[in-house]
Amino acid sequence: MFRINVDAGSDFLLVLEELVGKLSTNDIQSIYISDKPNSKGEQANSLCGRSVNDLGFKNGDLLFVTYESTGEPPKTESSAPLTTAKTTNGANVSINMNDISIPINKGPGPLKVDQLPVDGLLDKEEGMIMRPRSDLCRHGDKGMCEYCSPLPPWDKDYRKEKGFKHMSYHAHLNEINESKNNRNNATSYMAPLEEPNYNINLNCPSGSHAPYPKGICSKCQPPVITLQQQQFRMVDHVEYADSTILNKFIDSWRTTGVQRFGILYGRYEQFDKVPLGIKAVVEAIYEPPQSGELDGLTLLPWENERQVDEIAASLGLYKVGMTFTDLTDSGAKNGTVLCKRHKNSYFLSCLEVIMAAKYQVSNPNITKHSNSGRFSSKFVTCVISGGMNGEIEPRSYQVSNSAEALIKADIITGSTQPSMLYINDSEGKRYVPDVFYSKINEYGLEVKTNAKPAFPVEFLLVSLSDSFPLDPSPMFRENFPIENRDFMGDLQDLKSAYNYLNADPGDGSQLFDFHFLTYIAKTGILSHDELKLVLSYVRNKDQTDYLQLVESPGWMTFITILEQSV
C-alpha cells in the first residue's frame, strides 16, 4: 500500500515522481493509468501539467496502473496499493492501484500530443545550413570538405557571422536531441526538453520528515539557481500582417495621450531568415477592457475572453502575444516621442517582465519532446515606445524559461528600480534557494554574482525582430470601431453596425473584420450555427456560406434590428 500526500492544486507530476520511487521502474514513460481494471488507459506523463483537481479525482476513486519493470521483481501484493492526495479542505483523495501487470516491451518515444502545425513541419526538417564551395576547397564539383560541408542549425560561428544573438527553438531542440538520443536506437529515447523547476517539493520523496517549512532535505529542496542569458528563443520574429493593424492601435494614444494594451491574435509560421526559425504573424489586436492613464494603465475584467478565443480558433488563429504603448510626446510639435528605453535604462521594466512571464505561463508551448508535454511558451511581448531618433517603433521580446520558473516558484517581484528584479525572502511554504547570475566579462571569463537582493532584468530577456511584409495580404480589414474605446467616442453599437454594413457592396466583404465578428458574437442575435456560417465564410471565402447566411432567419433578424435602430 502506497500513500502519497499532495495538494488538490498540485501538478499530477508530483504524484508520478513519488510513485516511480515505489515501483520497480524508473521510467515514467512506461507507466499507464486507467480508471478501468482491464484497460491499459493513458500514458501517465500525458496527465502531467494538470492538477489533481483538474483531472477530476475525488475521494474514493480507483485508478489502475500498468508499467514496465526495469528488472526488479514485480510487486505481487494481492491488495491494491493506495495513493491518497490531500485536498485544501483536508479531505483525502484515494487513488487505488490494482492489477499491476508487465506489458510487452515497447520502445519509448516522443509523446503523442497536439503540437502547433509549425512545430510538426519543423520536426521533419534538419535545418542544415548549406555552404557554397570556397577558395579553400581542393576537390572537384562533386566533392565535399570541412570548408563547404553543411553546418548544423545551432552552429555558433554561423550565428556570430550573421549577427544572430539567439538560435531558434528547433535548432536548440535538435542540438539537445543530437547529444541525448541515438537515431539508430529508438528504445533508448530520452525526452530532450525539460523545464526548470525552482519549487520546493512539499511532499519529499524520502518521506523522512514533515513537509517544508517543518522539515527540509537535499531530496526536496531545489538546487542553487544560476541565471544566464538564454541562448535560444521560442519565436524569432514578429510580423504584422499589415501596418494598419499597428497604426490603428497607436491611434488611441495619438488621440487621447493615454496608454493602451492589446492582445495579439494570429498564427505561427516558418521564418526562413533563421535556420528552423518561427515567426508570429499578427492578424488582429483585440483591446480588452482597460483604464488608460498618461503613464500606465489598469486592466479590467475581460468577461468575453473565452468567446473571443473561440472566434479566433474558428478562423485558425490564437493568442500569439500582447502589446502595449509607452509613449510620451517630446514636445517638439513634430510628431516625435521621447526615447525612454535603451541600453542605459531598460528595455522591459521589472513589472513588465513579471507580467510577460505570467502570460507565458498561462499560454504554454505544447510539445512532444518533453515528459510533461510542455516547454516554455511562444507568447510574445511587444512594447511600442520611442526610438533613438524620436520615432515610434515596436520592439518585441520574450522572457526566458528561467523567468517562468521563477514566477511559478514565487521567487521574484518588482522593485523601485525598473531595471532590477527583487528576490523574495523565504516565507511560509515559499523556499528561495541561493540565486546567482552569470555573465562573461571583458576578458572573456565567466563571472558569477550573487543575485540577492536584486539583479538586472536583462538576464531574463530574449529579444526578437519584427517587421511588416513588403506585399501585405491581411486576413481582415480594419474599418469597424474597435472595442472598448467608448472614452474616445468610438462606439460599437447598433448604429455603427448599420453604417458599417450599409457600405457593403453586396459580396460580404464587410464581414472580414475581427472587431466586427466579435461584436456580432457578443450581441447574441445569431444562433450558434449561423455564427459558424459567418466564420466559415471569412475563413474559406466560400460564397455558398455567404448566401446561406443572408437567407438565415438570424441574419434577417439582425438586419431588421439594425434598420429599426437608425
From Swiss-Prot:
- InterPro entries assigned: MPN, Npl4, NPL4_C, NPL4_Zn-bd_put
Highest taxon of the source? Eukaryota
Keywords for the protein's UniProt record, in alphabetical order: Cytoplasm, Endoplasmic reticulum, Membrane, mRNA transport, Nucleus, Protein transport, Translocation, Transport
A single GO molecular-function term is: ubiquitin binding
Classify the protein's membrane topology as the record does.
Peripheral membrane protein
Provide the primary localization.
Answer: cytoplasm
Q: List the disulfide bonds.
A: none
The biological process GO terms on file are:
mRNA transport; protein transport; ubiquitin-dependent protein catabolic process
Q: Does the keyword Nucleus apply?
A: yes
Report the Pfam families cross-referenced here: NPL4, zf-NPL4
User: Where does the record say this protein resides?
Assistant: Cytoplasm, Perinuclear region; Endoplasmic reticulum membrane; Nucleus membrane
Which cellular component, as a GO term, is one annotated location? perinuclear region of cytoplasm
Q: Which purpose does this protein serve, as stated in its record? A: Involved in the import of nuclear-targeted proteins into the nucleus and the export of poly(A) RNA out of the nucleus. Has a role in the endoplasmic reticulum-associated degradation (ERAD) pathway.
PANTHER family recorded: NUCLEAR PROTEIN LOCALIZATION 4, NUCLEAR PROTEIN LOCALIZATION PROTEIN 4 HOMOLOG
Which protein family is it in?
A: Belongs to the NPL4 family.
Q: What is this protein called?
A: Nuclear protein localization protein 4
